[in-house]
């Protein structure tokens, strides 16, 4: 059988010009990424058409048959990759173009992965040996080759030898193209984490050479590595650093290094780049050492430096060293909203900009993203107190598993700026912060004691609760004795006991509390360029009430509102009296009606016409828009009248002035008066947006005009630097002395080169004089608890609590001014310009001038004790050494008698103010018996509390004896005595 003729494809096509019928197409399907990639590679391989003739051939030749399809390369799963990766060899020349395209796609994939917080953590690849990865000055990736001369393909994880990685890894050192050789030692931890994160895998690389060029241009991109708390780092690689600075002509900057101290868990040293360390003042460098000691002890503390000494910069630099040393991973910074911008600025200065995560915006989704990123990658989370209060469960990690379970605590540090905000531990703000787990807590506050000692205890209880114990212990051991000893009318024995207890308190908190004052850090003796801070003179301007203010003040004291407030809360009546002292137009309708009620007994006075007219106008009973005096009322308010005379003098001399008031309504009145005089001004209050505040502050600091800046104390007194102004006017005093101090320190801070004069306006013989006395009393408590010298006792609480009474000397004389003049009159040292300025002030019809800066400038001398007082004090002092050694359980009275029979025990307490029928001799006998029981060491050793309850009973009996001995004879009282607690008044 003959075989069939061979089938000639080309012959058949030549014989029959008719093309065959097209094959029916399948249903169109969407092209995937691989299909588009295959089409692109084939088109790239074929290249453009070689036929230059654009006209088609009428008889075209059929296309050549397609080449046999080659098998697709195998795909494998690599750690750190989302997609399957094709394997290729370096000798496969045909895949060169495919490799370049795949490299582009892989690079895009890794970049997208780096933007996601959900990407998997890089895992080590045990089957791939570590590859030496070198960075060269030539940024061309094609020059990077392996030791065997082959080009690395996409089957290996990319090394950091591209432009972005080289610049990112050394951006913090300010190194540009002068880099000649930088070697990293690679561990077995490889994984694709994107260009920005490849060099930051945990424990992946250790610097072998650290040389840098000192320049002001430095990137903050990848200066610090991630948190690393493992001990398997090659210490020889870290310590055996080879210096190549001489080869390239670099100027080397030495790092600041501190070794671990004590027996804490920290075993790695602290390293801070020298560029950052050189930015700090000497007192800030000392602050770094103090913070490092706390870190090694595993506890926290209070940074209480005076306002304007750069507390934020100290903490930022300390965090920079911790991140640089790989000692921490996450930090939570809680601050008022107005201070977050300042924190961002300071953290950026120390090259921590890329560590910042903002958790303060209004968008909840954006905040949650930042929080999740901080959990995943670490960093510094900036937020506010209110956001923590509402979201503390999320911040403590209740709803996420993004952090490693091996970590002991979620947050390494919780830092509270303006930490006195949590001075009341019962508030939701304080309780929410207590819920957040952390290893260290740092409180930043220039005023840790604002009203009473309990506020200082609250701050210590937050950051280091083991220092002062619980609240009851602190009150019984420290607070009561110090307050009694600080009273001007205290007995000699009370003063000695208070002084010794205060000394013990200072020694107790000394390791955990750091406070430096500006006059201690920057001495006033400097001149010229050596003078880092100017002088400050604070003056109390004692003003005389106008006739209108006097009539309103007296009328309100006779009103029913004052009499009813004496039986209840006096705050409403106190507020009205303060408004009358500032400006009568501040009175509300209800307050004006109360003033009218008190005018019945004063109708025969000559000047009642205008006063009654103003009161009726305020109460909406009369309307007289033509009365200019009622609209602005410079002659109605002594403060406004004096202020306009002072501004005329200051502006004419070219000074810039800050004016602070507690209320926006008072600022409105001042603003109207300034507009009438034609002065330019700027203003910030609670209605000003934060973005606008920054612009307004910049305009004042750098702008050519607007010599007057109006601010409210609650907004403008916090976080602003206004060193262009050298004159500050505080219109109305606050119950909280730190409020006024913060306002003053907007101008008196680092960077102020002019001498600052502060004017605190006070009205003589009014409620404001009582407020000023209370400020001084609170300031004495703070200094007694924190400063190592005996403080002057200016006032007693009995002087302060006489609020609702007319001054016997009238409104033209200030007894406080006379007392301060007698106390500090001989200390006045003024230059000619200040002396002339005070003479000008005294010509404005004021009651007098006091020098607030001289308060507490003298060291008081304790009076000598008689024999009986000396015996009592010697007996009481040993108890100060043993009182606090017990546990934190509550002390109870009569513990010795019922130590072995706790079920039959009935607690008995003593009130210092209660009347006792026991004589001092009987109380002393009880103390002696209990002391003998306490001396029986065998019995005390068997007690569960080791005698703490007995010591508590002895202390209570001793306090009771002190009250009885110091109490005067009972006086006949004409009526019910008003009892007002002024310690908690902080507004």
From Swiss-Prot:
Basic and acidic residues composition-biased segments: 99-110
UniProt entry keywords in alphabetical sequence: ATP-binding, Cell cycle, Cell division, Chromosome, Cytoplasm, DNA recombination, Helicase, Hydrolase, Mitosis, Nucleotide-binding
InterPro entries attached to this UniProt entry: Helicase_ATP-bd (IPR014001), Helicase_C-like (IPR001650), P-loop_NTPase (IPR027417), SNF2-like_sf (IPR038718), SNF2/RAD54-like_C (IPR049730), SNF2_N (IPR000330), SNF2_RAD54_helicase_repair (IPR050496)
SUPFAM superfamilies linked to this entry: P-loop containing nucleoside triphosphate hydrolases (SSF52540)
One BP annotation, GO: DNA recombination
Localization per record: Cytoplasm; Chromosome
Binding locations of ATP: 305-312
EC annotation from Swiss-Prot or TrEMBL: 3.6.4.-
Primary location class: cytoplasm
Span of domain Helicase ATP-binding: 292-466
Cross-referenced Pfam families: Helicase_C, SNF2-rel_dom
Motif (DEAH box): 417-420
Start-end of Pro residues biased regions: 18-27, 51-71
Tissue: Expressed in ovaries, roots, shoots and leaves.
A molecular-function term among this protein's GO annotations: ATP binding
GO terms for cellular component: chromosome; cytoplasm
Comp. bias intervals (Acidic residues): 226-237
Domain of life: Eukaryota
Biased composition (Polar residues): 141-156
UniProt enzyme class: hydrolase
Chain's role: DNA helicase that acts as an essential component of the spindle assembly checkpoint. Plays an indispensable role in the development of seed endosperm. Is required to secure sister chromosome separation during endosperm syncytial mitosis, which involves extremely rapid free nuclear cycles.
The family this protein is said to belong to: Belongs to the SNF2/RAD54 helicase family.
The protein's name in its UniProt record: SNF2 domain-containing protein ENL1
Organism: Oryza sativa subsp. japonica
Gene for this chain: ENL1
């Amino acid at each position: 059988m003959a075989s069939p003729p061979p089938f000639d494809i080309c012959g058949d096509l030549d014989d029959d010009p008719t093309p065959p019928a097209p094959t029916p197409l399948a249903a169109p399907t969407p092209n995937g990424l691989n299909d588009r990639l295959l089409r692109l590679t084939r088109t790239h391989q074929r290249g453009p058409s070689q036929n230059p003739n654009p006209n088609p051939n009428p008889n075209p030749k059929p296309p050549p048959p397609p080449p046999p399809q080659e098998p697709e390369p195998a795909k494998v799963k690599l750690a750190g990759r989302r997609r399957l990766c094709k394997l290729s060899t370096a000798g496969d020349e045909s895949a060169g173009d495919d490799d370049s395209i795949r490299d582009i796609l892989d690079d895009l994939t890794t970049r997208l992965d780096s933007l996601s917080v959900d990407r998997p953590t890089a895992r080590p690849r045990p089957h791939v040996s570590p590859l030496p990865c070198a960075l060269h000055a030539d940024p061309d990736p094609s020059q990077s080759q392996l030791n065997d001369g082959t080009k690395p393909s996409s089957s290996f994880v990319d090394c950091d030898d591209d432009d972005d990685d080289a610049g990112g890894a050394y951006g913090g050192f300010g190194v540009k193209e002068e880099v000649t050789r930088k070697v990293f030692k690679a561990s077995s931890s490889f994984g694709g984490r994107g260009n920005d994160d490849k060099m930051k895998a945990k424990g992946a690389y250790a610097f072998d050479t650290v040389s840098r060029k000192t320049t002001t241009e430095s990137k903050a991109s990848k200066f610090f590595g991630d948190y690393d708390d493992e001990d398997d780092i090659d210490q020889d690689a870290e310590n055996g650093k080879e210096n190549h600075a001489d080869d390239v002509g670099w100027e080397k900057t030495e790092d600041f290094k501190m070794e671990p101290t004590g027996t804490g868990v920290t075993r790695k040293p602290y390293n801070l780049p020298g560029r950052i360390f050189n930015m700090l003042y000497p007192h800030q460098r000392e602050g770094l050492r103090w913070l490092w000691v706390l870190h090694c002890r595993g506890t926290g503390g209070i940074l209480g430096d005076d306002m304007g000494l750069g507390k934020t910069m100290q903490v930022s630099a300390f965090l920079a060293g911790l991140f640089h040393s790989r000692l921490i991973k996450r930090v939570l910074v809680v601050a008022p909203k107005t201070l977050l911008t300042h924190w961002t600025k300071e953290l950026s200065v120390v090259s921590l900009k890329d560590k910042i995560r903002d958790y303060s915006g209004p968008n909840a989704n954006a905040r949650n993203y930042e929080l999740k990123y901080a959990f995943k990658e670490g960093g510094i989370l900036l937020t506010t107190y209110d956001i923590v209060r509402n979201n503390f469960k999320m911040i403590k990690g209740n709803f996420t598993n993004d952090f490693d379970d091996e970590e002991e605590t979620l947050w390494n540090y919780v830092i509270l700026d303006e930490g006195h905000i949590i001075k009341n531990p019962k508030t939701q703000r304080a309780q929410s912060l207590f819920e957040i787990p952390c290893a260290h807590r740092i409180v930043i506050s220039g005023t840790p004691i604002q009203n009473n000692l309990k506020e200082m205890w609250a701050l210590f209880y937050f950051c280091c609760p083991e220092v002062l114990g619980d609240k009851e212990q602190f009150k019984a051991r420290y607070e009561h004795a110090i307050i009694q000893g600080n009273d001007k009318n205290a007995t000699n024995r009370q003063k000695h006991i208070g002084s010794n207890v205060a000394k013990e308190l200072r020694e107790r908190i000394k390791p955990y509390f750091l406070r430096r004052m500006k006059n201690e850090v920057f001495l006033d003796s400097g001149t010229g360029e050596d003078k880092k801070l100017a002088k400050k003179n604070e003056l109390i301007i004692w003003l005389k009430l106008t006739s209108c203010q006097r009539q309103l003040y007296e009328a309100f004291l006779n009103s029913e509102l004052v009499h009813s407030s004496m039986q209840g809360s006096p705050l409403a009546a106190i507020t009205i009296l303060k408004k009358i002292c500032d400006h009568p137009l501040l009175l509300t309708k209800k307050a004006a009606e109360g003033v009218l009620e008190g005018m019945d007994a004063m109708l025969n006075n000559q000047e009642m016409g205008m006063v009654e007219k103003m009161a009726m106008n305020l109460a909406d009973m009369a309307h007289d828009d033509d009365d200019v005096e009622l609209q602005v009322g410079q002659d109605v308010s002594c403060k406004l009248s004096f202020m306009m005379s002072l501004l005329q003098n200051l502006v004419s001399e070219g000074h810039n002035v800050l004016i602070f008031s507690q209320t926006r309504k008072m600022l409105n009145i001042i603003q109207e008066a300034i507009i009438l005089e034609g002065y330019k001004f700027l203003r910030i209050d609670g209605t000003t947006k934060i973005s606008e505040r920054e612009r307004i502050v910049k305009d004042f600091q750098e702008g050519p005009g607007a010599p007057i800046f109006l601010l409210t104390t609650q907004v403008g007194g916090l976080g602003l630097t206004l060193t262009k102004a050298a004159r500050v006017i505080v219109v109305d005093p606050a119950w909280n002395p730190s409020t006024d101090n913060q306002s003053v320190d907007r101008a008196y801070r680092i960077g102020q080169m002019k001498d600052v004069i502060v004017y605190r306006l006070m009205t003589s013989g009014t409620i404001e004089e009582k407020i000023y006395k209370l400020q001084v009393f609170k300031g004495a408590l703070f200094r007694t608890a924190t400063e190592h010298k005996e403080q002057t006792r200016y006032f007693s609480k009995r002087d302060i609590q006489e609020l609702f009474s007319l001054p016997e000397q009238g409104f033209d004389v200030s007894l406080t001014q006379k007392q301060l003049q007698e106390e500090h009159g001989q200390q006045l040292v003024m230059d000619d310009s200040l002396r002339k300025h005070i003479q000008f002030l005294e010509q404005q019809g004021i009651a007098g001038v006091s020098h607030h800066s001289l308060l507490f400038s003298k060291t008081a001398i304790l009076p000598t004790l008689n024999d009986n007082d000396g015996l009592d004090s010697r007996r009481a002092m040993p108890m100060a050494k043993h009182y606090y050694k017990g546990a934190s359980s509550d002390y109870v009275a009569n513990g010795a008698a019922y130590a072995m029979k706790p079920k039959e025990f009935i607690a008995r307490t003593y009130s210092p103010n209660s009347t006792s029928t026991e004589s001092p001799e009987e109380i002393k006998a009880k103390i002696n018996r209990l002391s003998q029981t306490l001396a029986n060491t065998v019995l005390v050793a068997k007690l569960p509390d080791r005698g703490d309850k007995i010591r508590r009973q002895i202390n209570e009996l001793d306090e009771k004896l002190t009250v009885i001995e110091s109490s005067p004879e009972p006086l006949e009282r004409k009526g019910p005595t008003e009892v007002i607690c002024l310690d908690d008044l902080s507004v």
